[in-house]
């Protein structure tokens, strides 16, 4: 049986990150952590208790993030964990998808400190999805 790669993160676009974090905090009790400009002002959203490595302690539950909504990037998407991001990028293209790359360099994955290598792509139906090669567990 072929290995299944799990969904490990979700991402939602926001026109106003402060307003959106207040909404999800008040309705669902989620916690938010604003990252700096060097990380594109991304907001980490915790939906469940996380360990020291930042990953959820409860199996099957995922955390997420908020990013600035743009005309080209205005839909909610998921992040799928992979063992080898470059191999997964090739598989996406072979299957008819389009590699968008990371936020910082088109066609190349971003190296997110403390997290791993990240890359976005469009599937055959035009859905924006991302892949993540997590850093090895210490």
Residue ranges of model-derived segments:
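Generic "edge-of-domain/loop-turn" microfeature
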Residues: 17-19, 50-52, 71, 85-87, ...
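Glycine-rich, flexible loop segments associated with nucleotide phosphate handling
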Residues: 44-47, 56-67, 104, 112-121
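Core segments of cupin and vicinal oxygen chelate
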Residues: 2-4, 11-60, 94
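Short acidic/glycine-enriched loop/turn segments that link adjacent beta-strands
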Residues: 38-42, 72-74, 111-115
């Amino acid at each position: 049986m072929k290995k299944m790669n799990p969904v490990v993160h979700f991402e939602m676009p926001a026109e106003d990150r402060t307003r959106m974090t207040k909404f999800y905090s008040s309705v669902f009790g989620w916690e938010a952590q604003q990252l700096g400009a060097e990380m594109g002002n991304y907001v980490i959203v915790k939906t469940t208790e996380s360990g020291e490595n930042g990953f959820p302690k409860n199996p099957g539950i995922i955390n997420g993030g908020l990013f600035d909504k743009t005309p080209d990037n205005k839909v909610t998407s998921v992040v799928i964990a992979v063992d080898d991001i470059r191999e997964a990028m090739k598989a996406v293209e072979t299957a008819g998808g389009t590699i968008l790359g990371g936020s910082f360099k088109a066609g190349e994955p971003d190296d997110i400190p403390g997290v791993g290598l990240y890359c976005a792509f469009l599937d055959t139906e035009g859905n924006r999805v991302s892949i993540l090669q997590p850093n090895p567990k210490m």
